[in-house]
Amino acid sequence: MLALGLVSCLSLGTTLSAQRTKATTAKRTPIQTITPKRPAGQRDVLGLRLAPMPVVRVGFIGLGMRGPSAVERFVHLEGVEIKALCDLHPDRVEKAAKILTKAGLPEAATYSGEETAWKALCDRPDIDLVYIATDWARHTEMMIYAMNKGKHVACEVPAATTLKEAWDVINTAERTQRHCMLLENCVYDFFELTTLNMAQHGLFGEVLSAKGGYVHNLEPFWKYYDANWRLEANIGFRGDIYATHGLGPACWVLNIHRGDRMDYLISMDVPATTLPRFMERQMGVKNPQVKNGEMTHTLIKTAKGKTIYLEHNVTSYRPYSRL
């Protein structure tokens, strides 16, 4: 169960205290989320193991910002065949295809030009793994469709944007028994893996609390996201909307899903300031309404009483940090 709420401040005036408490209690009732029962016949996939594949045949969907670099990495992997490339924009597909040519690899099938072109890629019988690097809004639909077609899935974060989507992804993975991997790259970075290794060898004793975050001024990058989808996400949604860079490594160190689980959280933010000014100055938007706070702080409590502290800030002029 997760609960989301704000900590009430102690009232200084005893006369007004009862009135304020009554008013704020109604506004700050924790959001309760219930874990649904697993449908009959489903098995969890936390320990899913399948027979080894001598060759993994891969199809890529989304070749804008992150997709091409994934293709570049995969051309160096033994036991991998890149079978198909897909993006809404044909020029991006052509550019990614040149990566294969430069590496001396066979041409891949290409799909582009239509909103549903990616489905044809997932329908192919010669693909084992679908790699998704599109905008956030499309992740869930693509993951579920691919798994229902018998494919394993690797998807850039986030895997879902609503609780319903999250459970739909989980239920599909469990029902189809397909690997469904969240491509949270920071858990594999040098510092994070070194720290995890030290923790697992007992150098820190018992780890009781972990801290992480995503502090990254995205102002130089907004223009590169197709149709401003990432900027729109930060305008329209409140809270830590990009938590996994800091949360993923913390979960590994605290053995989340390996003996412990996250129980509830408290989250609060400060008013948005830098992004509205940017929108006025650079985009000519008058009186922009931005829901995402300048800084969001989140404190998570686990079932065993441990804590995780997260920060999210993508607009302030400060150095990049995940600590």
Where are these regions (language model features)?
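NAD(P)-dinucleotide binding in Rossmann-like oxidoreductases
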Residues: 287-293, 300-323
